[in-house]
Amino acid sequence: MALLQIAEPGLSAAPHQRKLAVGIDLGTTNSLVATVRSGQAETLGDNNNQHLLPSVVSYTAEQVVVGEQAKHDASLDPANTIVSVKRFLGRSLNDIRRSYPDLPYDFDESNPNSPLLNVTGRQVNPVEVSSEILTTLRLRAEQSLGEELSGAVVTVPAYFDDAQRQGTKDAAQLAGLKVLRLLNEPTAAAIAYGLDTAQEGVIAVYDLGGGTFDISILRLSKGVFEVLATGGDSALGGDDFDHMIVKHFRQQLGLEGALSKRLHRVLLDKAKFAKESLSDNDTVTVDFADDEQKLLSLSISRETFQGLIADLTKSTLRACRRALKDAELEKDEVLEVVMVGGSTRVPYVREQVGEFFGRTPLTSIDPDKVVAIGASIQADILVGNKPDGEMLLLDVLPLSLGLETMGGLVEKVIHRNTTIPVAKAQEFTTFKDGQTAMMIHVLQGERELVDDCRSLAKFTLHGIPPMAAGAAHIRVTFQVDADGLLNVMAMEKSSGVQAEIQVKPSYGLDESQISDMLKASMQNATGDMQARMLKEQQVEAARVHEALQAALNADGAELLSAAEIGTIQASLEVLDIAGKNDDIDAIKQAISAADAASQIFAEKRMDHSIKKALAGHTVDSI
């Protein structure tokens, strides 16, 4: 008798069957695909067990070629062989030509905002070219795993803007992939090393690939990675190391002037071999034939190689220093340094990075594969392959989160449909002179005014140093973890005083309530925007009135005549009346009139302040 299979209601007969998901590193120079098998993340190779797929696509009259063969075609047919297409995603034709003026490609001029490349017998755009690379990786994965994929996590540089991210997503969908998520490359590298569950703190990701260098400074807090700063050089990478060795070889051989394409390619190949061999050897010798088939032999030592690349390496460290400065951090505040990209295998690079940050970089995972491996771990989580106890619930925010600003306005910090976990920060300032506290009112919703949104929490930041209005810098950070728990922290930057609160944004809301809130925001969009513009002008009128009245009280009697004071007071009375009415144009005119009436007063105050500051000082002491 056949046995019946019994399943939980709503589930398949095999509810715990693993789903196949992959992580894809769509790189500028090389691309990879990885998956999690038997609990271990691994990259997948082709039929020749080659894991790195050169990100090169060649178009002929008969076919489209991707990978190693296309890379070989690059020197033979450069106009029809697209290299480093990732640089073109989401960019206009003007952007591309400004950044890369010497490209050998024939671009169609008809639509500069959506660049098209004329290749053999057809026109293609960067999304289509990228999709060829992604299709090759998808087919490799399906052949290796024996089934269709449930989805993929595709990585992008942390600095990619919305257009570049959308281009990447479109390319993946065109390649037949269900995109589970776009993941920042430095975050993927950190996940590969398990840093997402490690001690909280600052992580630097140093990514030196074949053609580009990127440095990313991340902060890990409550399981969420926040990108604090990014930097780098889109025209510096391991290829430049190869060119420095070629230059050295040419000097050894006394070769000046142009080289034949064949000899140039041979020298580049030998330079790459020498670079890689010097990671394990003190000296390397290469043999090759010149154009006259004369056999030549050249040697290069590790010491010489290090001298050749010293300036290039220093350039990457300068970018690291700038990124730390942008993040307002010191080197000793960095907890871990993750190395990404094949060029970080060079011992000299690792030594210099270690010396710069004052700690040994993480290098145990193949730097070529670390991003794809991290992406595959994330993909495995997103398709639900983790046991219940380890299940990470990842979703999107159903409604925007923000806070109240002056005038009862809502400033959105994290917009709806943002994937969680997520962290975002914005800076705010004080409205009044000498203000020492700020009430933080956290709101949820899509409307422009506080009264039309849902109040989540209120807390007060005390201890703000007394300053002039607008001088204090309060950084408010919103963090939503994988369980949808919101943590809001406010910190005054000069003193370091801070306060925070936690709240569950979705608590008490069902789908129908969320839907109603979204409908209301769409139905009232025009009216809400007009109300916001009016409130903003009213707040500005109140700010100008308060600042000008305070200045008059402080210095008016000393610096102005009675007539001048009367003129300013009259403009303030007009401003006060206008600010209480609903005519936006009248408020704007009243603000402009008050500014004009107080112009001479502002100049006198400035002169008075300078004289006061210089009193009792000699030129030499200043």
Curated annotation (Swiss-Prot):
It holds the Pfam family HSP70. One of its GO terms (biological process) is iron-sulfur cluster assembly. Disulfide bonds: none annotated. It comes from the Bacteria. InterPro entries: ATPase_NBD, Heat_shock_70_CS, HscA_NBD, HSP70_C_sf, HSP70_peptide-bd_sf, Hsp_70_fam, ISC_FeS_clus_asmbl_HscA. Signal peptide: none annotated. GO terms for molecular function: ATP binding; ATP hydrolysis activity; ATP-dependent protein folding chaperone; unfolded protein binding. Belongs to the heat shock protein 70 family. Chaperone involved in the maturation of iron-sulfur cluster-containing proteins. Has a low intrinsic ATPase activity which is markedly stimulated by HscB. PANTHER family: HEAT SHOCK PROTEIN 70KDA. This is Chaperone protein HscA homolog. It comes from Pseudoalteromonas atlantica (strain T6c / ATCC BAA-1087). The lineage of its organism: Bacteria, Pseudomonadati, Pseudomonadota, Gammaproteobacteria, Alteromonadales.
